[in-house]
Amino acid sequence: VSWMKKLASVVLIFLVVLASGCVGTADEKVQTGETKSPTTTAVQEHELVPASISLSDRIYVEIDPRIELVTIIYRLSNPEWYRENVDPTRVGADSRNYGYLRDVDEYFGPYRDMKAVKMVPEMIREGIEYDAIPEFAIHLSLTNFSKAAPWDDMLELRPDLDTEKLDEFAEAVAEFAEKTNFWRFYREHGEFYNRTLEEFAKDNPGLVDLVGFEENFFGKNASSWRVVPMPLFCCHGFGYHTENGENVTVYAFLGFGKVDGGVPHLYATAGGSTFLAHEFAHSFVNPAVDRHYELFKPYEALFNPVAEKLKEMAYPNFRIMLYETLVRAFEAYYLNATGNPDMAMLSLSRNKVFYFVDDVYRAYGYYAAHRDRYRTFDDFMPELARVIERVYNETDGGKNVVINPTVDDFLKAAKTGGAVVAYGGSRSAETLARFVYSSFKRAGIDAELKPVSDLTAQDREGNLALILLSNSTLLQELQKKAPVLINGTTVYSRESGKTYSGSLRVLEVIENPWNPGALVFIVVGTDERALNRIHAYRHLTYSIRDSFDNLLESG
């Protein structure tokens, strides 16, 4: 999900790349495709059914009461995981502009001492976080919220789960629902839930077309598709599926991106967003990988070069890395196939930590051109295994893989070790540096601000954020291993081999040349006009933009 913070004409964007299948929402809504006119099912007194909108005879958007109940319990517990990852305050929603939060806190606040709430930190340690939260919830009964289905499917992905602890938590959740009369709260908010669903359908008109695209690409139809907005979780989305014989139900559990008019909004298909495409794809990709995992198992060492980064994103092993790589390659394929080739390339560049995503993306082109041979995605898995084998051989089992640092890496290093923000060359460089400094301080980073001329030898060996003009004498030392070289008004990309000239702004994150254990975040303008703003997406290693803010290249 991306957010823009504005200060005068200066913009600093930190794009959070979310775990477990999180992708960005679009800032603009584009009307694409047509859907069946939605029909709303209101929640009546004593009816134990979710608030739901039907987009077709197989596609539903609903507020699942089981998920709502469990997310309320997580909110009441307010653990660090909730605050840092899914708390609505992360997208500017609070009790003043989002009345639903106020209602939840006022109605359920007196019950914070109940067992279910007290168990949340323990359940997070157990692994019930991110996607596991809604997955746990849909195993509960819609009638009384007790355990209604075995945990077997959850254990396939998380074999270390303590089923006795899951049973205990389920009992505590049911007790919480009964004690608080949760159904009363749910019924009283039926109008809010239905407004949320209606706005979702309005914001995402291409949903029916997306379902058709996915079923055609993967060669398999689902019995039903259920999109579940989560009004208490922001920023993250999760995919899941359940099977009952030949019947497959595909789920997408979606956190929201903003609040407008007291209603949560998320753009999951509009404006080139692949939020929903990503989550739906997991329901086809994950089981295909599971059925053929023995083909990929010999290449598990490919996880090692990115293990630390992926574990931070809640992707703890090679199997899940495969899930995410194949799904993210599908996102790019979907964008290209639906008339957004530039966004497809941008999608790939944002996913460089999944370092063989480009290889899989190219393989999908071959798959699409030979559907007479590969009727389903499952049929293509042996070929994908050969693609991964080639990557394994070319990288010596991952030993030769180099992952360049990103804005996210710099922010994490600065959060731990502090940073010095230094500027030189012009008034515009100082103005931009002051904004970067203020942004760091708001993010809890221990930062200093000073002109480049005041940098000490000790400063140079720490994490640096440098805002410079292209005539800076520091550039010669900084650019020895940088992906982009700047010389006056000319910029050369070592990544693409392209040369650009004019009023340009370059952003780079590099290893500190004076101390390999630290990082340097650099913004260089070929003239003062180019330093009018900054886009520092978390996934970026570098970007080149002109002074009109047009993106020329990134990676």
Question: What kind of region is each of these model predictions?
Answer:
Residues L155-L157, F238-A270:
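Active-site scaffold of zinc-dependent metalloenzymes
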